[in-house]
Amino acid sequence: VANVSSTNPQDTNRIVSLQCDMEVSKLRASMGDSIKLYSARAKAQAALGPQEVDVTKPAIDFSLRADSLFFSAAGTRMAMNVAGIKMKADKLNDSLWMPKGIVGFNRLRFRTPEFGLPIRMSKTAVTVDGPKITLKNASVRIGRSNMTATGDMMGVYRAMTKGEKLTAHLSLTSDLIDCNQLINSLSFPEDTTEVLTDSVPSEMKLFVIPRNIDFELQTDLKKVIFEKMLFENVHGAVDIKNQAIHLEDLSMRALDADMKAVMVYKAGSPRGVYAGFDFKIRYINIAKLVDFVPALDTIVPMLRSFKGRVMFDVAADARLDSAMNIRIPTLRSAIHIKGDSLVLMDGETFAEISKMLMFKNKKENVFDSISVNVTVHDGNVTVYPFLVEIDRYKAAVGGEQGLDMNFNYHISILKSPLPFKAGVNISGNLDKMKFRIGKAKYKDAVTPAAVHRVDSTRMNMGNEIVNRFRRVVLGRQPR
């Protein structure tokens, strides 16, 4: 049913006023082969008339209420339940109209070919102002993840119909973000079963960031699941642009420790990934730390011999293969570990050293403090000499190892009950170690000046890694 009325102005330059009231049970429309629109049980009003500022240019007022509304374009589909639209559009030139108004709905479901999970929104209203859409406390659900979004989005229509850039500036709050499921939805965009089966992927796979995404997000997240880790109270900025994800100055809590993090992930194609992170973790249990960063077992295997809490700073970057494995020759890292009252647990290595140096027979030996600098470059790990005090001894420990687990460490005895200064050389690998008594090599390596130089070396390397992050986020190749 439709009612149409019009006016015939005396001024021939003035746009004719035309009004149409329409009520339909079903409405189908299409534009070309890709854009389709369907509506059920709809009431609509449309009015064409002159613009207020220029009567020679047309303006359209449009309102619609529909039990359901469906729209599809270029493989992207959007469906709304109990939809309401109130819009006004002024014509700017021959092909450009500028819409303003409100779109509301009880429920919305959105699907795109690049993402394996539907995006669902509950009852909300969004404001439209030209290409800008404004959200206010919009409730969004993606699989097991939920969030509330406030902010602006630009270019939604052109992103859906032409694949052009989609820009967003949003504040997000959430009770739960399941990164495993979201990553799966990017890794397997056409396989919903694969995405929904398990929150913990049995094997992490490379996922490519869509080229047309440019998001700046401020986050306040209660819980975030990533692999087998649970992060709580996550706050900070997340930028997604230039096919990269940049987590900037995030604060969080996990493994009973406070953390701050900067992270970058860039995947422009399925062939490989650049990834990097800069973590500062305060007073974390060593056993949990090794579980959190499993690569530490390879880089600093001696760490598992200690018990206690440490401050842990690490900056690292590397290229990953399509299965998200580190390409070892590309790994660069700068690590600092500091702890007080750490317990060295008894083991074969310590037992051999104790026998050689005549330590008192103890199952546990306490270090007053340690401060260790480690760097990784070109497949080699360097543990810079650091000072330890245990039992009646003061010693400097350092050395090198390959990521193939072959190592060459040295312990210089600087103070002991023995009448001479000596050193212990430890070489080989964890399965077959050789111990030799020799000269103390690190007599001058743990002076304040030497330690300061080492600190500077490690910090400079860490800064270089973080600077590479910034180049990647700006769309440049890391050097």
Identify the meaning behind each predicted range:
Residues L135, L247, V383:
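Short catalytic-loop micro-motif centered on adjacent basic/acidic residues
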Residues V1-S122, V128-P131, R141, S145-L250, ...:
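Membrane-proximal interfacial segments on either side of biological membranes
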